Amino acid sequence: MIDDIAVPLTFTDAAANKVKSLISEEENTDLKLRVYITGGGCSGFQYGFTFDEKVNDGDLTIEKSGVQLVIDPMSLQYLIGGTVDYTEGLEGSRFTVNNPNATSTCGCGSSFSI
């Protein structure tokens, strides 16, 4: 876990509060939000979010408001400088990634290229 040093990724209050709410609904305080990148989507890479009880060797863990965001080292290299947020709007509610490393994104924002 990172404390008081430069964190390479921002985990917003909105995202942390939604994670806290979802963990409460599941009644499992061991859950953490894992963000990862896989190949696919219309732009080459896509973001994924899942709840995970494990933190693997090499994972980066960012804690906010009593909940944890976990990123594997391979995904982190594509996410440095980014922001994990939670938004609600006309397209529905979802976790999002604002990624300054992406050179282009698809219309829905779920895939990107570098």
UniProtKB/Swiss-Prot annotation:
Keyword Iron-sulfur tagged: yes
GO-annotated biological processes: iron-sulfur cluster assembly
Keyword Iron-sulfur carried by entry: yes
InterPro entries to which the protein is assigned, alphabetical: FeS_biogenesis, FeS_cluster_insertion, FeS_cluster_insertion_CS, FeS_cluster_insertion_RrpA, HesB-like_dom_sf
Cofactor(s) needed: iron-sulfur cluster
A single cellular component GO annotation: cytosol
Keyword annotations from UniProtKB, A to Z: Iron, Iron-sulfur, Metal-binding
GO MF entries: 2 iron, 2 sulfur cluster binding; 4 iron, 4 sulfur cluster binding; iron ion binding
Function, in words: Required for insertion of 4Fe-4S clusters for at least IspG.
HAMAP family: Fe_S_insert_ErpA
Subunit structure comment from the entry: Homodimer.
Family assignment from sequence similarity: Belongs to the HesB/IscA family.
Protein name according to UniProt: Iron-sulfur cluster insertion protein ErpA
Species lineage: Bacteria, Pseudomonadati, Pseudomonadota, Gammaproteobacteria, Pasteurellales
